[in-house]
Amino acid sequence: RLTLEEKRTFMNQRALAASPLLFGGDLVLSSDEDIALATCPEMLACNQDGITAKRIYGTAHVDVRQKFTDMEQRHGWIGIFNRKGCNYRFPLKISALKLPEKTDPRTLKDIWTGRPLEFLAADTLLFNFKAWESMLLRF
């Protein structure tokens, strides 16, 4: 069984890849949690735009993907993934997110939890992820 964080990561991967979403479960017997994952409006908006994200930053244990939803590259999505099989606390320079010039990182929140980004310093973010956890941010 997958944890809630792993389920969200699975959905984030599909959304950023613009992969077809298929629900193979029994809708009547599915948990409210699983239905909420499959019907999250923000995740569906990311998935349904038909654009595949590109890797913009990576290390052995961190992967960052981004895609733009407009030609001017002002709006889009960023996925930040803990690829380590255990809890992982790591810093990340804001510049690694390659945000558009006028985007304030203090306004970004995870689509699933509403959790804002945590700052370690003015130019550095701090992530404290559970095993295989990720965030999907809309900018």
Task: Name each region found by the language model.
Residues 80-82, 92-94, 110-112, 121, ...:
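Active-site proximal loops enriched in glycine and acidic residues that flank catalytic Cys/His/Asp
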Residues 21, 28, 83-86, 113, ...:
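Short, glycine-/Ser/Thr-/acidic-enriched flexible segments
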Residues 16, 78, 108, 132, ...:
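Hydrophobic, well-ordered secondary-structure elements that form the walls
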Residues 34, 38-75:
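Membrane-interfacial catalytic/cofactor-binding modules of polytopic membrane enzymes
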Residues 14-17, 22, 58-99:
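Carbohydrate-binding surface patches
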Residues 95-114:
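Solvent-exposed beta-hairpin/edge-strand motifs
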Residues 1-49:
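Aromatic/acidic polysaccharide-binding cleft in carbohydrate-active enzymes
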Residues 118-139:
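C-terminal beta-strand-rich structural cap/linker in extracellular carbohydrate-active enzymes
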